[in-house]
């Protein structure tokens, strides 16, 4: 079982969309996937629950609210969810730096943090890296945080200006981005469809946008498998 946490202290950067695309790609490969949604907005859950009713390969979990700010309580609550064996676990987090995200960072094998060529999003990755360092310290891990963090560069629509070029170079040079995914209208609207790409094509939807989404999903899953040599 591999545990992947999608995280950034900056909200609205596309964590839930990337998490869903990743799940979509893994499901098409025949993997058994569990999603854990720690974002109070529940965006990933809203996409996944209808699919889980149709596919036993997808499991959806939401951690019950814990009033305590104890790291140990949140960490142990996640451990309890992970007791049911699956091939992959994908954790979606809120755009914050609360104790739930700290636990999600501590429990995972890999952190994926999306960023476009915007200073606020790059700073969100940098803050997430520092928070990951804190999380690893909490569990006594000596793994270097940079070894666990992978940045997915999200290429915006239109032509980038000079500042965007600078930010893109920073993302690749400093963080070593693993992918370049185009923020197309099809991908950004993916969560609202509440079905997998394969289901949408089978249902008779225009295949073109879904094939683009599948290509993006495949890039993500190939990157994941490359990280773990699986």
Predicted regions span which residues?
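Pre-Walker A (Motif I) flank of P-loop NTPase domains
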Residues: 1-4, 160
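P-loop/Walker-type NTP enzyme "switch/lid" segment
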Residues: 3, 7-9, 13, 21-90, ...
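Conserved Walker
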Residues: 17
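Hydrophobic anchor at the start of a short beta-strand
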Residues: 32-33, 89, 111, 146-148, ...
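Inter-motif core of Ras-like GTPase G domains
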Residues: 100-119
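Anionic-ligand binding region
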Residues: 123-152, 161-170, 174
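Beta-strand-loop-alpha "switch" segments that mediate conformational coupling across diverse proteins
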Residues: 154-200
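NTP-binding/hydrolysis catalytic cores, primarily Walker-type P-loop NTPases
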Residues: 197-230
């Amino acid at each position: 079982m591999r545990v992947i946490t999608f995280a950034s202290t900056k909200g609205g950067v596309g964590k839930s969309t990337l998490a869903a695309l990743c799940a979509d790609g893994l499901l098409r490969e025949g993997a058994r996937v569990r999603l854990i949604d720690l974002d109070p907005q529940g965006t990933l859950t809203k996409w996944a629950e209808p699919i889980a009713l149709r596919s036993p390969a997808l499991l959806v979990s939401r951690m019950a609210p814990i009033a305590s700010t104890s790291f140990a309580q949140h960490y142990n609550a996640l451990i309890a969810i992970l007791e049911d064996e699956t091939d992959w676990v994908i954790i979606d987090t809120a755009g914050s730096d609360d104790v739930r995200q700290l636990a999600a960072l501590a429990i995972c094998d890999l952190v994926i943090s999306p960023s476009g060529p915007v200073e606020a999003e790059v700073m969100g990755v940098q803050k997430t890296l520092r928070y990951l360092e804190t999380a690893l310290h909490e569990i006594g891990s000596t793994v270097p945080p940079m070894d666990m963090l992978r940045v997915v560069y999200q290429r915006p629509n239109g032509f980038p200006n000079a500042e965007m070029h600078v930010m893109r170079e920073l993302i690749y040079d400093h963080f070593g981005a693993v992918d370049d995914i185009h923020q197309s209208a099809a991908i950004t609207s993916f969560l609202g469809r509440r079905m997998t790409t394969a289901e949408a094509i089978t249902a008779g939807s225009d295949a073109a946008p879904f094939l683009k989404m599948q290509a993006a999903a495949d890039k993500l899953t190939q990157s994941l498998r490359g990280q773990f040599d699986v």
